[in-house]
């Protein structure tokens, strides 16, 4: 259904069929560190970067406690930071000073699926995102060298890809900010169950 939603839309179909290369690897340097990025699709002559994304709901917003504002799925999942980094590396590759166009083609997991094509170009926001990267570059370098473990945010693509379940957790842990004084009781019940199951 999701693929059909893409192919039935004239604009998205045009972007998909546009001459360009898929899964393009580019390398560059940012803040004194080597970076390697993978572009879902790159149309070099038009300097167009296309990223494919799925989301539960394209219009749903999330509250960000740091800013006190509600954010789109693209902001909440760090796609603007990704766009800022990819754009800088692409500029080095293309030997240009202006930004390439960065488009996210997104489809929702709803039935029927929603779809959208979003331009992420926003130089002020890119500058902010890059300043955040620079602020944490020492930590990023330590993670890359294997000297420290990355901090899990639970939102980005890396987190679910590397997530390992170590125990069954109470249902209420899915509710942000919700806690239950009986959590230790749940842990005891689960431990007793596992002990019995392994006997």
Predicted regions and their residues:
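Metal-dependent nuclease catalytic cores that hydrolyze phosphodiester bonds in DNA/RNA
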Residues: 1-39, 151, 157, 173-177
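Low-complexity, compositionally biased segments
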Residues: 4, 12, 43, 54, ...
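Secondary-structure boundary elements
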Residues: 11-18, 43-51, 90-100
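Residues in well-ordered beta-strands of folded domains
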Residues: 23-25, 42, 105-106, 160
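Non-catalytic protein-protein interaction segments used by genome-maintenance enzymes to assemble
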Residues: 26-80
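Metal-dependent nuclease catalytic regions and adjoining charged, substrate-binding loops involved
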Residues: 73-80, 85-199
